[in-house]
Amino acid sequence: MKSTEYRVQSTDQISLGQPRKRSVSETVCQQSGLSGEAGLPAIIGITGGIGSGKSTIARELVKRGFAVYDCDKEAKRIIAENKDVQQQIINLFGEKSFVNGVYNTQYISKCVFSPSLQGRSGEALLAQLNAIIHPAVGLDIMKRQPDFVESAILFESGLNLLCHRISVIDAPEDIRIARTIARDYHGDASPANINKVRARIHAQHIPQGDLTLLNDGHTPIPELVDEILAVY
C-alpha cells in the first residue's frame, strides 16, 4: 500500500459554501517542510456516524496487520504529551486548562458549551481549540504514515484532505441507536437516552466518500473489510 503516492488536495478545489480557510493539509505541509505538491504515502480514511461500526471495522484491519490511526485516541495522547499544544490551549483557556499536568476536560467542556467566556462565544472557542488540535493530529499522521485513519469527524477536521481514498461506514438509524445505547448508556434504552442518541445522530452529517459500506449486521465484518481492501 505504501508504494502508492498522491498529491494533497487543495481546498481551492473543494466548494464548502464558506469562506476559504487554511486547511489542515496546508498547515501540515508547512510545519513538516513539504510543499502542497509533494508526493505523500497513500492513506485510506475510515469514517461514519456514531453507532455505524467504524471502530469495529478498524479493529478488523488491525487484526490483519494494518496500521490504523485512531484520531480520537491519538488526539488525547497529543494533548497529554505535546508541550506546544498544551501551551496553546493554556493561552486560549487559561491556567485551569490543566490540573497537575492533566488536561481538564470538564473545565474545557464547560468553556466551549457555555454562552460566552471573556466575551468569546463557546462556538468560537471550540473552533479555536480545533484549530490547535487538528493540525497537530494531521502532522502526527504524516509522521506516523499509517495505512488507515479512523475519525468520526474526518471531513469536519479537514483530515480528509490527507487521505487518498475514504470509506464511509453506515447503518440504519435504529441499529445505530441500539449500538450506541449499549456502548454509552450500558443498555439503558430509556426514552430520554434514545432521544439523546437520536439527536446526536441527526446532528451529524457525513459527506459521501469513495466507498460506502452498509454495516447492518447482515454482512460479516471480515467481508466488509474485504470490500475495502478490494477497492484499494
Please report, for each region that a protein language model flagged, where it lies by residue.
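Extreme N-terminal, non-catalytic leader segments
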Residues: K2, Y6-P41
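Hydrophobic anchor at the beta1->P-loop junction of P-loop NTPases
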Residues: I46
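ATP-binding Walker
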Residues: S52
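Walker A/P-loop
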Residues: S55
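ATP-dependent small-molecule kinase phosphotransfer cores
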Residues: K73-P146
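Small-molecule kinase domains that catalyze NTP-dependent phosphoryl transfer to phosphate-bearing small molecules
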Residues: V137-I141, L161-L162, E173, A182-Y232
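ATP-dependent NMP and nucleoside kinases share a basic, alpha-helical "lid"
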Residues: D140-M142, V149-I181
